[in-house]
Amino acid sequence: MTDRSSNEGVVLNKENYPFPRRNGSIHGEITDVKRRRLSERNGYGDKKGSSSKEKTSSFEDELAEYASQLDQDEIKSSKDQQWQRPALPAINPEKDDIYFQQIDSEEFTEGSVPSIRLFGVTDNGNSILVHVVGFLPYFYVKAPVGFRPEMLERFTQDLDATCNGGVIDHCIIEMKENLYGFQGNEKSPFIKIFTTNPRILSRARNVFERGEFNFEELFPVGVGVTTFESNTQYLLRFMIDCDVVGMNWIHLPASKYQFRYQNRVSNCQIEAWINYKDLISLPAEGQWSKMAPLRIMSFDIECAGRKGVFPDPSIDPVIQIASIVTQYGDSTPFVRNVFCVDTCSQIVGTQVYEFQNQAEMLSSWSKFVRDVDPDVLIGYNICNFDIPYLLDRAKSLRIHNFPLLGRIHNFFSVAKETTFSSKAYGTRESKTTSIPGRLQLDMLQVMQRDFKLRSYSLNAVCSQFLGEQKEDVHYSIITDLQNGTADSRRRLAIYCLKDAYLPQRLMDKLMCFVNYTEMARVTGVPFNFLLARGQQIKVISQLFRKALQHDLVVPNIRVNGTDEQYEGATVIEPIKGYYDTPIATLDFSSLYPSIMQAHNLCYTTLLDSNTAELLKLKQDVDYSVTPNGDYFVKPHVRKGLLPIILADLLNARKKAKADLKKETDPFKKAVLDGRQLALKVSANSVYGFTGATNGRLPCLAISSSVTSYGRQMIEKTKDVVEKRYRIENGYSHDAVVIYGDTDSVMVKFGVKTLPEAMKLGEEAANYVSDQFPNPIKLEFEKVYFPYLLISKKRYAGLFWTRTDTYDKMDSKGIETVRRDNCPLVSYVIDTALRKMLIDQDVEGAQLFTKKVISDLLQNKIDMSQLVITKALSKTDYAAKMAHVELAERMRKRDAGSAPAIGDRVAYVIIKGAQGDQFYMRSEDPIYVLENNIPIDAKYYLENQLSKPLLRIFEPILGEKASSLLHGDHTRTISMAAPSVGGIMKFAVKVETCLGCKAPIKKGKTALCENCLNRSAELYQRQVAQVNDLEVRFARLWTQCQRCQGSMHQDVICTSRDCPIFYMRIAEHKKLQQSVDLLKRFDEMSW
């Protein structure tokens, strides 16, 4: 139970985790400012806290609007009744079919019998669990020469004995082909070995791969035998063989399934079992592309910790939990509640539950989850913080039933530490918690995987995608709110409720759930694989499905990784410069997938010279030689499996896009758009799968052949365009390809107008496309005008797809889109480019740049513009790095606020002593502001701004571009006077005259004797300065009040991702110093 009589405990808001936090004061009102200095205009607000008459926040208005949409009788009725799922209609297993959308699946072994559990929801909203039985795991080995069918029974017995018994169920012979390498289209016998359960399949596999099985000398001892499809997860094997894909609909035919009345294991409304042979998987098309009425629950917790220490679930209590439950397809939540320790004033449109102690609250919330029975759990950082913390806290309090959060009786959820690592997403330490029957969609993980942002705090993400800031409350203030009154806890509850509501809004805005659903359907993997696994599993699933249809088996290749590399894509040397004529851009549509299709590149078509000679195949007739010397048979000999997969994906995408244009229902449109995007991503990932040297099935012959064809095509495109579009062929100018990169070329036709450039671009695309085999197609999509070409992979220009107006300013490789520099760089480069490209005012761009540099050197740039963020990706670095060293220093100051692996660390570069290494000069921005530590403006100019500025100005100004970094505008330099560190440790502060700065004795008046005759003038000047700073601070304060939704409460937000926050701290510091100076006049005798 929380001890509210003590002020020693402080509340830590989990939203700040895993983002850097530190102890510090909250910058609020300035006290002791006398009324003679216009204090009635300071606008700081009422300090008495919330009251019943206070204007409601904007979020409260939204809650009221939700409440108004509900029937009044429904509002007055018991909330518990609203939580329940719809009543189950009468179902006769002998006569009634059951259709449901399966959302979660797991493998389960009961005794020694394996089964699959499919959790789902029917079209009526009823929950269901289906036990699928009868499916056994298996793998293949190639039958050796001399192996006869009559040997099969003895082979099975001997193999089982070698595996120590109870492992092999039975074996059969099937005619298959090895997927890897062309062998003449002839099938050969393979032994299909079924094991009794998935956990011991590896035992049988190892017997073959280690050469431990000797059967009539056909499998020599000590010689390893390649196994096929022996490393496939049992659940995925079942889904592949039964054509089940993630999130699709399942049909249980009447009389084929049975209800499980005895020994029910779940709290689902329907529980049944069926043999896998009778289950019907429905393709995710037409009416079966719909979504069931899934229940989506978003939640957030607030927990209390000790001062300066991050909450420990074994000690620190959970004080509030907010939950919002929405049915998929509805815009209005049907459940909005907050579970609170201690009393809490009512919140409009929200059910508030008060509890005397924490154990009661946690136990009731766990029961609430089971009663409302959500299909999807969402939130922000719930996987790494909320769920594990709740479980550990309940364990500490010995609340036995709390971990029963899933749909299986007596299954206690436990959080486990995991490390996720992939080339695409990097390395992240995280936690996973099994909650059977419920999907977990952590919006923080979604953001980190799908978007490259400077910061992943909820506030930064909401600002980016929802266009609004979020109040971020410092944990020391949350302490006061919790230990205060029912009204103050109401404010905390609204804050908690909003943090539960925002992930739902983000999910809806970005269509994350529907996009991931379609990705699961397209690739065939379970939904939860999409966040927990990398890219390869998606291709593996598609490859195995198509291999099954063509009687191909996939070898289990042991890969230890290799340093072997292949040449990448071609980049045509750029003709750098500023182009004030239209530049047409020609792009190859789906270049790498189309190359694999056009040239039949696949595992199944890969040929070696010996096989070609043995089968008497003819070069250029039966097989082709790629530019890097690999052999692949032509389609009339064998159609490759990868080209078939790619053709199916791209054709399905065309169909989805065509259906999207005709569809009018917004939810169906969202599904179709998510589907076409998933199909595009899946097609593009096939090439990467073949080139992953540490992957499941690497084949550098395929990946290097693809890039070699790509290089050849780019060079050929350049040659064809420049030879055709010449003056001698009747055109007004000689065309020049000024740049080419991977799958596109930029062409200067020499014409002056957009319509002419677009016409020639369209014509050239069609002409070049005819030079290549189908389905390779060069498309004209856009014109850049004007165009700034800086270097390889660095350019900017106005993007035109129609002649009446430009679409956007587009840039690549320039600091406007990079996140490893401070925001000032992006702002300056973006503004300068807009002046040059949109306004075509190069002089204005120069003047703007000089003004920013001058402000930087005079310490006039806001701190928020100087913050650099870098990812902390591992614990050990070969070299000392600024963000790593700062993270360590922050850990020593306050271990609870230290960044964790995978977080982005925010820092600024400060002035250091001569000889200080760069990594020693990184510092926490808040610490810098609080202690007046001077920023190293020279570093920002020379290491952050200079190179990007020279890159964009040199193509226009040439050598004169360097004048931007030197001259009159750089001669005035000022910096803050530090209050800590360095020589200040030994300095003795001496008071000076406020008029002439002459030293005076401490405790004397504000002015020296020489300035006393100017006392009235100097006093008025100081009052004016205070008034000016009061107004500036009040404006920032008011802006923050508007953001928090209340003009009558103190601002308690400490969002490090908001520029207003840094401004408010800086102005507060200036105002406090100015007030202190003004107080010195009080000591004078007037």
UniProtKB/Swiss-Prot annotation:
GO cellular component: chromosome, telomeric repeat region; delta DNA polymerase complex; nucleus
Subcellular location: Nucleus
Motif CysB motif: where in chain: 1040-1058
EC number(s) recorded for this UniProt protein: 2.7.7.7, 3.1.11.-
Ligand binding (Zn(2+)): C993, C996, C1008, C1011
GO molecular function: 3'-5'-DNA exonuclease activity; 4 iron, 4 sulfur cluster binding; DNA binding; DNA-directed DNA polymerase activity; nucleotide binding; zinc ion binding
GO biological process: base-excision repair, gap-filling; DNA replication proofreading; DNA strand elongation involved in DNA replication; DNA strand elongation involved in mitotic DNA replication; DNA synthesis involved in UV-damage excision repair; DNA-templated DNA replication; mitotic DNA replication lagging strand elongation; nucleotide-excision repair, DNA gap filling
Cofactor: [4Fe-4S] cluster
Gene3D superfamilies given in the database record: DNA polymerase family B, C-terminal domain, DNA Polymerase, chain B, domain 1, Helix hairpin bin, Palm domain of DNA polymerase, Ribonuclease H-like superfamily/Ribonuclease H
Residue ranges, compositional bias (Basic and acidic residues): 29-58
CDD domains cross-referenced by the UniProt entry: DNA_polB_delta_exo, POLBc_delta
Main localisation: nucleus
Protein family according to the UniProt entry: Belongs to the DNA polymerase type-B family.
PANTHER family: DNA POLYMERASE CATALYTIC SUBUNIT, DNA POLYMERASE DELTA CATALYTIC SUBUNIT
Swiss-Prot/TrEMBL domain comment: The CysB motif binds 1 4Fe-4S cluster and is required for the formation of polymerase complexes.
Protein name listed in UniProt: DNA polymerase delta catalytic subunit
Protein species of origin: Schizosaccharomyces pombe (strain 972 / ATCC 24843)
Native organism taxonomy: Eukaryota, Fungi, Dikarya, Ascomycota, Taphrinomycotina
